[in-house]
């Protein structure tokens, strides 16, 4: 299947991140190369663009797309949680800008074989990195009921989490839950009919929760933000696009902490942390325009936040 992904907040991201056309930029979630391609078109031949992604298909697609770009560019197959080690291995200390476009790509959602989508049937997988040993199949078929309920509640904010976990465990006693369609059927059976009539697809929140658990999406967010800021030149920027409230809260909190001089507990009468402000916000959090949402409904929950090193 050809790698296809509609990039969200494309021009908004590039306009805010690009500060020096001769600089070094890192796209930490390369995907199909949408942001990187738009960035590369504005970079000088001596600039360096680094693309990082754990998905081999994404690396291959971006490599083809950027093959004719004038600027220097290279790709690294890795998780952005290792950004410090990646830059160290490339003997790069300071960077002009970092791009993060979090969440699942359109390609991953539309390719049923990847097991991300409740709309396209396929084996339960949901791994962004195919080298990851943990799959959605293992979570759904081996996790204890209490742990499943916790994940679905915390990561999916699903009000029927306990009931869904109960139904999953009862169903798998008869036979394994092997496909996304199997899981959707169990979820629909667990959620009362009156609760399924309105709102999003009944499986949306549970699928989100399992995907987050498979890829440890929330657990790896804060540390890379701190690492990126430590590698920013003064005036360099980090831009992050989130697609759900859990991610956005983590990013917002991480940036707020780095914007503060003192991070001591409020009950301390005197500052003892000696923490200095590292960044400042560039504009307000930005959401897609009504036109973009109309053209790409998946963009409706996107939020862009940008900070600059001071």
Identify the meaning behind each predicted range.
Residues 1-310:
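S-adenosyl-L-methionine-dependent methyltransferase catalytic core, i.e., the SAM/SAH-binding region
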